[in-house]
Amino acid sequence: YLAAWKGPVYEKDDPYGDNQTNEDLTAVKHVQEMQIIESKDYEKIKEAVFKYGGVQTSIYNALRSSQSSSPYYNKSTDAYCYIGTEKPNHDVVIVGWDDSYSKDNFNTDLEGDGAFICQNSWGDNFGENGFFYISYYDTNIGTHNVVYTDIENTDNYDHIYQSDLCGWVGQLGYNKDSIYGANVFTAEGNETLKAASFYATGKDSQYELYVVRQFEDETSLEKMIPVASGKLGNAGYYTVDFNQGIEVDAGERYAVVLYIITPGSVHPMAIEYAADEATENVDLDDGESYISANGSKWVSVDTVEKSNLCIKAFSDNR
């Protein structure tokens, strides 16, 4: 949704809780980078809050609305803590912390003090004007964390090319930590390719990006033009600017190639595929993708898994 430029939209234009969605809304910003913070790394979470303003995290929410009650929520102190085996079912944004926030503010007996200050999506009627505390000892707080590290204006690029509207659903690989992947697109006009985006599925990933012009079939992938390389500290979604723009002509088929090494992984390439009921209607016929173990012998990704590779391209008109 966010990586595909379908959002975000302003809450005033699509209010929470009205059970309606305005399909005519367009993104008011373009999200170009999202980093994943490792589970329960509270210091990294605090650092990200300080640097970027907020960290999205998942909790088990026993409340069903802003008016609900729960043994895990102390309404008088706006303090929540769940300890148990239930899986996360709700996202909130960590916007601050208080290491000395008393454990006595919670309904649960806890080992120590400390809490994150979080903002919910239920409006000003919940908590203290929409904010509340979640104990450091909550089972799920800080386990699944995303921080939005590059949010740009909507005029940053003229075009986005993509076939993975659902984004990172699963992973593909050759039972080793490296893989080549290529997505093929058709230029809408006379353009200059400026950047590509992809997912690093684990920390400390190294990448190389290439472009292939005048793509005809997989043999065209022998003519890769190097455009960028680097190393990424965290798992996440990244947009990388090319070292030089690559001009393509209207109607020209071209490929963006990603070579990625993710230490410890055996399936380092992020893919979109029909994994469950939530993704069973995903369009897997809108893309053309190839994979390779060594960069010389390529096969269509559909021969391995009916899927789309999560590689996008960005261009400007010329």
Give short role names for the model-derived ranges.
Residues 1-115, 119, 124-202, 230-234, ...:
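Predominantly the structural core of cysteine protease catalytic domains
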Residues 204-284:
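Aromatic- and Gly/Pro-enriched, solvent-exposed loop/edge beta-strand patches characteristic
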Residues 33-36, 192, 208, 226-231, ...:
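Ser/Thr- (and often Asn-) enriched beta-sheet segments in non-cytosolic proteins
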Residues 96-98, 196, 211-216, 260, ...:
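Residue-level signal for short segments within beta-strands and strand-turn junctions
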Residues 142-154, 239-242, 285-291:
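Short, surface-exposed secondary-structure junctions/capping segments
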Residues 259-318:
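Short, surface-exposed beta-strand/loop patches at domain edges
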Residues 149-152, 214, 312-318:
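Short beta-strand-to-coil "C-cap" segments at the C-terminal boundary of structured domains/repeats
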